[in-house]
């Protein structure tokens, strides 16, 4: 079994890449694919780049070129719910686009308006979070091609689809995985509250996301070990 592990930014995958053994690296389509073993399992780790197009293209490459049989996307997101806080995790039970006309998208394979996380991968993620002492919520993730960093945009997304967090890649990864019948799950550690404070910290001041990424890295490593 080959497990594909993705992130959108280098910081989101660097810690995982550092854990790999027997590593080979291939540059393909502008993306570095790190093949190796993690907890004795064959994995391919890559930084897809930000946004839906990058995420979709890289997911297909992982499946077609590298034979990924399961996909785990790990990274950070903006919190949209009072049920959790900064540093906590959302596990994607459902993932959808907040910036697309869903009744148009669902006219093509896989004919879905939203995408379900794989039950076995969700269970593995829930167990890994519990064992790591990380508070996790299995819920809804919304994806769009913008960084949500103001209250007005946040409120509009809340009114449209009421997600638990918002990010820029998950639905695209999930759509391509579903199209290929490959099990997939999206994991997100909360780095901000998708408001003005988040924009100031992450965009203006370029604050380090290492502590949030470390949470996601621990969870993914534990999941791979359990699979």
Which residues fall in each region the model found?
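Short, conserved "active-site rim" segments that organize catalytic pockets and cofactor/ligand binding
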Residues: 1-20, 42
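Glycine-rich phosphate- or other oxyanion-binding loops that anchor nucleotides, phosphorylated ligands
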Residues: 2, 26-227
């Amino acid at each position: 079994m080959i497990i594909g592990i993705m992130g959108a930014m280098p910081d989101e995958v660097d810690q995982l890449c550092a854990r790999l053994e027997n590593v080979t690296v291939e540059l393909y389509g502008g993306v570095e694919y790190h093949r190796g073993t993690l907890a004795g399992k064959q994995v391919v780790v890559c930084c897809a780049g930000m946004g839906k197009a990058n995420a979709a293209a890289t997911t297909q490459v992982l499946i077609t070129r590298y034979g990924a049989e399961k996909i785990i996307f790990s990274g950070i997101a903006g919190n949209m719910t009072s049920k959790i806080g900064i540093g906590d995790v959302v596990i994607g039970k459902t993932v959808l686009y907040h910036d697309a006309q869903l009744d148009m998208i669902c006219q093509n394979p896989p004919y879905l308006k939203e995408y379900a996380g794989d039950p076995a991968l969700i269970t593995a993620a829930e167990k890994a979070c519990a064992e790591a002492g990380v508070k996790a919520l299995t819920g809804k993730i919304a994806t769009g091609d913008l960084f949500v960093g103001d209250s007005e945009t946040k409120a509009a997304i809340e009114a449209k689809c009421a997600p638990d967090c918002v990010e820029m890649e998950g639905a695209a990864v999930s759509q391509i995985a579903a199209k290929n019948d490959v099990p997939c799950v999206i994991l997100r550690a909360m780095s901000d509250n998708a408001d003005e404070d988040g924009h100031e910290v992450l965009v203006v001041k370029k604050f380090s996301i290492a502590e949030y990424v470390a949470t996601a890295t621990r969870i993914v490593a534990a999941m791979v070990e359990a699979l």
